[in-house]
Swiss-Prot record, chain A:
Entry-linked InterPro entries: AAA+_ATPase, ABC_transporter-like_ATP-bd, ABC_transporter-like_CS, ABC_transpr_CbiO/EcfA_su, ECF_ABC_transporter_ATP-bd, EcfA2, P-loop_NTPase
Subunit composition and interactions: Forms a stable energy-coupling factor (ECF) transporter complex probably composed of 2 membrane-embedded substrate-binding proteins (S component), 2 ATP-binding proteins (A component) and 2 transmembrane proteins (T component). This complex interacts with a number of substrate-specific components, including FolT, PanT and RibU for 5-formyltetrahydrofolate, pantothenate and riboflavin respectively.
Name by which UniProt lists this protein: Energy-coupling factor transporter ATP-binding protein EcfA2
Localization annotation: Cell membrane
Span of domain ABC transporter: 3-245
Annotated gene: ecfA2
Membrane topology annotation: Peripheral membrane protein
Keywords, ordered alphabetically: ATP-binding, Cell membrane, Membrane, Nucleotide-binding, Translocase, Transport
Top enzyme category: translocase
PROSITE patterns, A to Z: ABC_TRANSPORTER_1 (PS00211), ABC_TRANSPORTER_2 (PS50893), CBIO (PS51246)
Curated annotation (Swiss-Prot), chain B:
Major subcellular site: membrane
InterPro entries, per database record: AAA+_ATPase, ABC_transporter-like_ATP-bd, ABC_transporter-like_CS, ABC_transpr_CbiO/EcfA_su, ECF_ABC_transporter_ATP-bd, EcfA_1, P-loop_NTPase
Lineage: Bacteria, Bacillati, Bacillota, Bacilli, Lactobacillales
Functional note: ATP-binding (A) component of a common energy-coupling factor (ECF) ABC-transporter complex. Unlike classic ABC transporters this ECF transporter provides the energy necessary to transport a number of different substrates including 5-formyltetrahydrofolate, pantothenate and riboflavin. Expression of the complex plus FolT in E.coli allows 5-formyltetrahydrofolate uptake; 5-formyltetrahydrofolate is not taken up in the absence of FolT or the EcfA1A2T complex.
Any single Gene Ontology cellular-component annotation: ATP-binding cassette (ABC) transporter complex
Enzyme class label: translocase
Residues annotated as signal peptide: none
CDD domains linked to this entry: ABC_cobalt_CbiO_domain1 (cd03225)
PROSITE patterns found in the cross-reference section: ABC_TRANSPORTER_1 (PS00211), ABC_TRANSPORTER_2 (PS50893), CBIO (PS51246)
Record's protein name: Energy-coupling factor transporter ATP-binding protein EcfA1
Molecular function terms, GO-annotated: ATP binding; ATP hydrolysis activity; ATPase-coupled transmembrane transporter activity
Active site per the UniProt annotation: 163 (proton acceptor)
Length: 285, 272, 267
């Protein structure tokens, strides 16, 4: 159940005088059961790309095949509901979407829209809330009484409640403190363990190396590279400069060491890797 | 030593829960203090109390020897500039120049003097080329630099940044931190800087780090002193800066505290 | 992307762009006022010529002005149809119950259409060449005399400029919230009218909450930057009339005099 982009081009206002081309000739497969990170500088087209995953945007030319669902430019809005029941999307700062009288009601919104009976929707909502560690005592409160971190988790539960097979997250860690970021990464790992296909956009390379199995690099509206995080982060620095991306912190540190004449065996991508390599050097002296 | 900010016996409750009780903090003039804590630790509330946006139940706040009261609040505010977390929710003007002008208009600067002051402030933060741009065309980091310029134009003695980089991407964060360092260098002891953050790599830049949790001071000292308390930091939901966490994992550690630059230097000389 | 501004402003360097916004506002009002006294084809033609001249002076393609007419198309059509079928008089061309097509009716319909079009075109000249904040500044300046009767002009004007600054942001946010709720299965296109009306709640509540939070944050930021009394503030953007404005006013007076002349001489 993978996702395939087949020769996808996308322009805003296609066919009018104000047409703005955004995506060019995208041909890419997002593998099933894995966590895929979409990285690229601001303006590279990442947000436009992921909006094709649940039909918020449709390709101007080409098609996006999500499992057995084919998304083309002429698909009508009413046919997209079945897609959205299977592809859950968590936007940046998702706490901005909360609206209901209680937390539970808000999380039930998606399942009810997708046709769940009320009792089933309630059960699904409670399951999702537990999945993101929102404790039961908060379920009857107004979502607006919660802290920022709690609100975000309620919003995520709101997407998970309809039990989608595919989950897309746009900068899920934006604005979170270190503890919150750790919890977020744990949730992403949990989704993968549950067999979901996870796609996320991130600017934090340390998160990418921590949870991603697969990386897609975008630049200027096109896909310029694909591979495992190790493959991508071992490309040469010139390439990183052209796509305006950074290495994970350990890699940046190692680069600065290299510039001072201290060259390591290979490029470390995690702090623990870097420490191990430095310690091993000492032993060989 | 003149105290820029002096907080004595502060008591403040939020939603019937006590947040600060008998909280004390002194900040010397010219210091750069990083106030760190996880989200919900009370650090932003403290900033709002200092500026009189919230009122404490008990306790005294003095800014450069002036007691904060209902009567003095406007005068006290004139000595402090504050940059808030959300880049959009503090951008008042229709363009960059108009936003910097807003504060000048409030304090009734002559119209003829405004263009020069606006230019000076924008030059310090490197945004003078964006003078006529509208906010929705700017990135988060650019908006925060404009916020800094708006504050600088009023020539405050203290600048407080309340999680000013929390909503920015790594690039935006880097440019704001660079601008702050440049500022502190340029104004030296004339400027007292308070950065409120949960990002430890930012806290490294300060002269002094104060760790807060649940309205209480947990640690208070130089970066060297505070970052040697790895366990205490973890217990309070925080982490070490990258360089210090790395040093912790090394078998052969440096014999003193080092920031990133120093650690790189130390490691590179070791290998030669 | 999201270029639906209320009367879209297009930056430019024409003579009209450089006029003081107050001149343009006063000019628009005077033109509309005078033009509404038009009853002869000659005065309509004269008014139209004036508008065409003004449009040429803005140095913008007519296509942009045509775009300004499109939204009002149905309103114009509706009014024209009313005139066409319900104007009494002779000679009568068609007759069906209360509906009557008469020659005076046809003439009135054409005149009504011309009036509408000219008013829209003139207003479009104003909004096309004047940024929204200049319009707000101009309003504040022109409404100053109302301070004497305790109208809070300074506060209203500040509110207006801040509100205007947030229009692009609010439009973006509306789109984002709609995307989020659509992703959760919200649909405006299914269900009966009640269901569709209820569907707007998940859109409005977040927008309201967001707007309130924004207002609170802004208020804090404004206070911290020394804002106290809206009436005790100096201004960065000072409006001042120039020689171009003088010429513009002379042009307006000339237009009015000739208009009156035509009315009296072709009678």
């Amino acid at each position: 159940m993978a996702i395939n982009f087949e020769q996808v081009n996308f322009s805003y206002g296609a066919g009018t005088t104000l047409a703005q081309p955004i995506l060019h000739d995208i041909n890419v497969t997002i593998p099933d059961g894995q966590v895929t990170a979409i990285i690229g500088q601001t303006g590279s087209g990442k947000s436009t790309f992921i909006q094709h995953l649940n039909g918020l945007l449709k390709p101007t030319t080409g098609r996006v095949v999500i499992d057995d669902f084919v998304l083309t430019s002429d698909l009508k809005e009413k046919n997209l509901t079945s897609l959205r029941a299977r592809v859950g999307m968590v936007f940046q700062f998702p706490e901005n979407q909360l609206f209901a009288n209680t937390v539970l009601e808000d999380v039930m919104y998606a399942p009810i829209n997708f046709g769940y009976a009320k009792a089933d929707a309630e059960f699904a909502a409670k399951t999702a809330l537990k999945q993101v560690n929102v404790s039961e005592e908060l379920w009857d409160k107004s979502p607006f009484e919660l802290s920022g971190g709690q609100m975000r988790r309620v919003a995520m539960a709101g997407t998970l409640a309809s039990n989608p097979d595919i989950i897309v997250l746009d900068e899920p860690a934006a604005g979170l403190d270190p503890k919150g970021q750790k919890e977020l990464l744990a949730i992403v790992r949990g989704l993968k363990e549950a067999g979901k296909l996870v796609v996320f956009i991130s600017h934090q390379m340390d998160h990418v190396i921590a949870v991603a199995d697969h990386v897609i690099v975008m630049h200027d509206g096109g896909v310029v590279a694909e591979g495992t995080p190790v493959e991508i982060f071992n490309k040469d620095l010139v390439w990183f400069k052209t796509v305006a991306l950074d290495l994970p912190k350990a890699g940046q540190f190692a680069e600065q060491l290299r510039q001072k004449g201290h060259i390591l065996r290979h490029r470390p991508l995690l702090l623990t890797e870097l420490a191990t390599m430095l310690n091993e050097e000492k032993r060989h002296e | 030593m003149v105290k820029a900010i002096k907080i004595d016996n502060l008591k403040y409750s939020y939603d019937e829960r006590s947040l600060f009780s008998d909280f004390n903090l002194d900040i010397d003039a010219g210091q750069w203090v990083a106030l760190v804590g996880h989200n919900g630790s009370g650090k932003s509330t403290l900033a709002k109390l200092i500026l009189g946006l919230l009122v404490a139940e008990q306790g005294d706040i003095d800014v450069f020897d002036e007691r904060l009261t209902v009567e003095t609040v406007h005068h006290v505010r004139s000595k402090i500039g504050m940059v808030f977390q959300n880049p959009d929710n503090q951008f008042v003007g229709a363009t960059v120049a108009d936003d910097v002008a807003f504060g000048l208009e409030n304090i009734q600067v002559e119209s003829s003097e405004m263009p020069q002051k606006i230019d000076n402030a924008l030059t310090i933060v490197g945004m003078q080329e964006f003078k006529n741009r509208e906010p929705h065309t700017l990135s988060g980091g650019q908006k925060q630099r404009v916020a800094l310029a708006s504050v600088l134009a009023l020539q405050p003695k203290i600048i407080i940044l309340d999680e000013a980089t929390a909503m920015l991407d790594p690039d935006g964060r880097a440019t704001v931190m660079e601008t702050l360092q440049k500022l502190k260098k340029q104004f030296g002891k004339e400027l007292t800087l308070v950065t409120i953050t949960h990002d430890m790599d930012e806290a490294t830049l300060a002269d002094r780090v104060v760790v807060i949790n649940d309205g209480q001071k947990i640690l208070d000292g130089t970066p060297a002193e505070v970052f040697s308390q790895r366990k205490a930091l973890h217990e309070n939901g925080l982490e070490l800066p990258f360089a210090n966490e790395l040093a912790f994992h090394l078998n052969e550690k440096p014999n003193k505290y080092m920031d990133e630059r120093e650690l790189i230097q130390w490691l590179s000389t070791l290998n030669k | 992307m999201n270029n639906i501004m209320i009367g879209r402003f297009v930056p430019g360097d024409s003579w009209i762009h450089r006029l003081d916004p107050r001149t343009k506002m006063i000019g628009t009002f005077i033109f509309i006022f005078v033009m509404l006294w038009s009853t002869l084809w000659a005065t309509y033609a004269w008014s139209a010529a004036f508008v065409v001249l003004a449009i040429r002076l803005t140095k913008q393609p007519f296509r942009l002005y045509w775009d300004g007419l499109k939204p009002i198309f149905w309103l114009i059509l509706f009014t024209v149809v009313l005139q066409l079928f319900f104007t009494p008089g002779t000679p009568v061309l068609l007759h069906a119950g209360p509906l009557k097509v008469t020659i005076p009716g046809i003439i009135n319909a054409i005149y009504v259409m011309i009036r509408f079009v000219l008013i829209i075109l003139m207003s479009t000249i104003l909004t096309l060449t004047t940024p929204p904040t200049s319009i707000a500044n101009a309003l504040e300046s022109l409404l100053k005399p109302l301070k004497k009767i305790h109208v809070p002009v300074a506060e209203l004007s500040l509110m207006l400029s801040i509100a205007l600054r947030f229009v692009p942001l609010l439009m973006d946010e509306t789109q984002k919230i709609m995307n989020a709720q659509k992703s959760r299965g919200m649909s405006f296109s299914t269900g009966g009218p009640i269901k569709r009306a209820k569907a707007i709640v998940p859109l409005l509540i977040p927008l309201f909450v967001g707007a309130l939070q924004r207002a609170l944050d802004l208020a804090n930021a404004m206070e911290v930057r020394g804002f106290q009394d809206a009436t005790q503030r100096t201004k960065y953007r000072v409006l001042s009339y120039g020689s171009n404005d003088r010429s513009a006013f002379i042009g307006l007076i000339g237009f009015t005099i000739i208009f009156i002349g035509i009315k009296f001489f072709i009678k």
